[in-house]
Amino acid sequence: MAKPEPDVVVPEGDPAKGAKLFKSKCAQCHTINKGGSVKQGPNLFGFYGRKSGSTDYAYSDANKNSGIVWSDKHLFVYLVNPKQYIPGTKMVFAGLKKEQDRADLIAYLKEASSK
């Protein structure tokens, strides 16, 4: 069963600040450029608006069966605690607790994953 989109308001984010967060918190496991390599985690290019677990990567069944289509609202809640939002995910990231950090990272991810 698909996870419904959360009823949250996502603050405006700053992509430049999000880029710094990506570099310090995400880049060790993810790339985000077209044709980028798969590391411990999948390349995130083009993931925004796509169904979770649907690219060429060995996703967990939890990700593949979540029914999530990545949006601001899903990412905003997911990034607090990935393992709580999708129990069984392979994502080992502990999460970002600050709302503005999540908003900044989302702004960057949306921008960078479409270039």
Curated annotation (Swiss-Prot):
UniProt keyword Iron, yes or no: yes
Pfam families tied to this protein: Cytochrom_C
UniProt modification remark: Binds 1 heme c group covalently per subunit.
This protein's UniProt keywords: Electron transport, Heme, Iron, Metal-binding, Mitochondrion, Respiratory chain, Transport
Subcellular location: Mitochondrion intermembrane space
UniProt binding sites for heme c: 26, 29-30, 91
PROSITE patterns: CYTC
Family: Belongs to the cytochrome c family.
Function in brief: Electron carrier protein. The oxidized form of the cytochrome c heme group can accept an electron from the heme group of the cytochrome c1 subunit of cytochrome reductase. Cytochrome c then transfers this electron to the cytochrome oxidase complex, the final protein carrier in the mitochondrial electron-transport chain.
Listed name of the protein: Cytochrome c
Species this protein is from: Theileria annulata
